Amino acid sequence: MSNIKLGVEVISAQGLLQRDKHNSCSPFVELKFDNQIFRATTKHNDPNPVWHECFYFVVSDPSVLSTRTLEAHVYSYQNEFDAKPFLGKVRVNGTSFVPRSEAAPFNYPLEKRSVFSRARGELCLRVFITDDPSVTPSVPTPVPESPQAYSPSPRKEHVKSLITADASMATDERRELKPKTRTFHNSAPLVKQQPMMNYGIHEMRAAPMPPRVVQVNGPGPSLHQLPPDFSVKETSPLLGGGRIVGGRVVRGTERPTSGTYDLVEEMKFLYVRVVKARDLPNKDLTGSLDPYVVVKIGNFKGVTTHFNKNTDPEWNQVFAFAKDNLQSNFLEVMVKDKDILLDDFVGIVKFDLREVQSRVPPDSPLAPQWYRLENKRGEKKNYEIMLAVWSGTQADEAFGDATFSDSLVDSDSSNIISANLRSKVYHSPRLWYLRVQILEAQDVIIVSDKSRVPEVFVRVKVGNQMLRTKFPQRSNNPKWGDEFTFVVAEPFEDNLVLSVEDHTAPNRDEPVGKAVILMNDIEKRIDDKPFHDRWVHLEDSISDAMDVDKAKKVKFATRLRYKAVLDGGYHVFDESMYNSSDLRPSSRKLWKPAIGVLELGILNANVFHSMKTREGKGTSDTYVVAKYGHKWVRSRTVINSMNPKYNEQYTWEVFDPATVLTICVFDNAHFAAGDGGNKRDQPIGKVRIRLSTLQTGRVYTHAYPLLVLQPTGLKKRGELHLAVRFTCTSVSSMLMKYTKPLLPKMHYILPLSTNQQEALKMQAINIIIVRLGRSEPPLRREVVDYLTDWKSQLFSMRRSKANFNRFTTVFSGALSVWKWMEQVCTWKTPVTTALVHVLYTMLVTFPEMILPTVFLYMAVIGMWNYRFKPRFPPHMDAKLSYADNVNSDELDEEFDTFPTVRAPDIVKMRYDRLRSVAGKVQSVAGDIAAQGERVQALLSWRDPRATAIFVTFCFIIAMALYITPFKLVALLSGYYFMRHPKLRHRIPSAPVNFFRRLPAMTDSML
């Protein structure tokens, strides 16, 4: 049997409904889990009872523990003959079960049993999992027959716990009850004793069904031997707006924080802004001063940059110290002189933290003040420093520019590039499609050889993108008509360069002339109206081509005719269409008003595997990046923490619900001054949330698994705790979005080919990488690549299997209907077959009822499935992706580069495997084509006898159907199709035999 048990401690209840004639109630609690029912004692005439009773349920199958549900029903006892008035219930999902070391009492609001029932109040429970073999499951006691059995009596229970460093905790409980009561004893070695607590007797009523017994050979798995959990877990954190329970915000007694930060936990910081100093003394022998400031609280120390030979420096740097980690009651701000061997002391200012004032936005920023520095003897000097010290939260304006105490590797932060640690917001550039059409050229003359007719082509270049036309017929006035599409970013930095070149040899091209068109001079359009052509003179170099005055003086030169336009009616894809976060066109004129607001609270993360080693210990330096639309956000980097806390909140405007929010976690490899530029930030995991799967107004608080697929297999590197809320500002506009096209209309009027879209998407990603790489701190290439996920289009045997499984799953419903119809036709269930006959007769007799019946049936199914609607947003499914049990060679092939770098024998093996799979696909495609060719052969006279038979049959059937009512024909056909097995033959029917004998084009295949 499994050693895992579910422990439930019933602590108390408050605010219960008063259901008896004395305006009170006598509550008791029934706990139900896995066909096991336990009952707490009855508290007579107490609407705010206190129990402190603990029960242990047997977990029969730990592998499905996350799918189980614990139910706690609260009733009021009246007498043994009356019904129990219902006071409320609580449902706790299995995904919320945690080890005992992490469990804490929680007040669950009581829910109604049905629409017409009433419920009020809260029930305080403590739910946990334990695998301690010394803890025995609760044993049922007989339910007394008399009302006196429910009277309360004083009982005591001593609980002693064994706490280990991991998540599981071994418990030893000894219950001492009065005589005439049943006592349970559990013995185990004691390490740490908890305070004495009073518990009540464990009562249990008989369940309506016998408990399920599962026999397991061998010992059961421990809590840490369970398979890895790749599912999403619902959490109930205490955020700024209150406790989140089931998507609802339960307000507490404390004053809520500002609504701007109601999706994150409030974090308090001590902010120190070092502005500047003046009239500092000279310390060096040369009569100069290289000042810098040290801000110190306990063991935390922040250091500003130093200035060379400056007695009036200006720093304007902010330091933030987490108030829950402060190790001293005093703040020291020291000014020092940078020296080669030992830095000299200049002066110091001390602050008592108890005197520091608090500031909460929307209060104005705190004005800095001048403070006179003291020497080591405490004497005031004439040189001063300007400081501002205040207590605030992450809602403060200085939060984004501050250097945090958890971002310091050691006591000296001078080797830290603080810019790479701060939270920032990025905006990707607005992308346009540039459509260029090369028409013709005139007077193309080769100066070196005027007698030779040139073979010219045009090279079109925009930034790093370059395409070329085909070779026309040799002529001095060539014509092309080729059209090209590029991606450009606004604000426009690159120009359109047209270069005419002469192909003189197989590997030799000589320039004829160049023309430069400024991007701002190109017209823009938002529809499919024709755009105008232009003539341009060719110059010898780009500098001459950009000289406007010289172009006006040219009397004779080679001319090029072209068309160019910026298409603003398209949406430029920079990510996969199915995972797009924005579908708006490039032109702002076509943008519609926003339909809602998306709010994201990045709470914290749990990193299971260290990403690097520092000072002989494994650690991680993590940050979070989220993308939606044109807005990218990056959280601050938390140094040396496997459980970082961010508590940062961001908002986006939503223009379409059929979009996806992408969040990724990375390990920072570029924060130290000694880090080289060749290092890459390693991804820890990714989360995608589709907005259309979210209920408006609900707060989704979940722990998402961070999964990364590597050549060694699927790894769960941690969990990311998020709070997401989608608020709709216009319900009618959002509902109308479901009737609108997904993409702008230009994608349907002048569609781009699939290959063209993929090429343009890669150009767009490269442009975004370049633009975001210029920011400070830069958003690096590996981050953009991982968020856009452009590698998903590459071949993968794993994805091929997963997509084929999805294909079969989609049609599994139709296959089930076909199997059910076979059972109807074979009369396996005569009652069902008879009912189908009756229904079929009604539909044929009244055909106008067919469509209403079908749509009514679908409506009823939809309403029935509302009870089972998904409660969690969808997440990356390891089983659906075939990532949990994939072949190592297939993974190695998936991570191979282009071109391959594997050994020839491995490539040969993979090629042969691909050939075998392709051969099966080829055979299936040929069989499908053969069936269609047989249909065509019915009237093609390829088989004259078969066609003659079919034509004669059609003529006879036409005459018969003309004189026979259609309803009669339909009834007879249906009855014949569902005829009894005694009227059937095992051999194929005549129509099937006739169809299989028809010829196909397979005979003509080589």
Swiss-Prot record:
Belongs to the MCTP family. The keyword Transmembrane helix applies. InterPro entries: C2_dom, C2_domain_sf, C2B_MCTP_PRT_plant, C2C_MCTP_PRT_plant, C2D_MCTP_PRT_plant, MCTP_C, QUIRKY-like. It is a multi-pass membrane protein. Its cofactor is Ca(2+). GO terms for molecular function: metal ion binding. Ca(2+) 1 binds at D284, D290, D337, D339. It comes from the Eukaryota. It comes from Arabidopsis thaliana. Ca(2+) 2 binds at D284, D337, D339, D344. Gene3D superfamilies: C2 domain (2.60.40.150). Residues 1-108, 251-371, 411-536, 579-704 form the C2 domain. One of its GO terms (cellular component) is cytosol. The lineage of its organism: Eukaryota, Viridiplantae, Streptophyta, Embryophyta, Tracheophyta. The chain crosses the membrane at residues 842-862, 946-966. May function as a signaling molecule by regulating the trafficking of other regulators. This is Multiple C2 domain and transmembrane region protein 9.
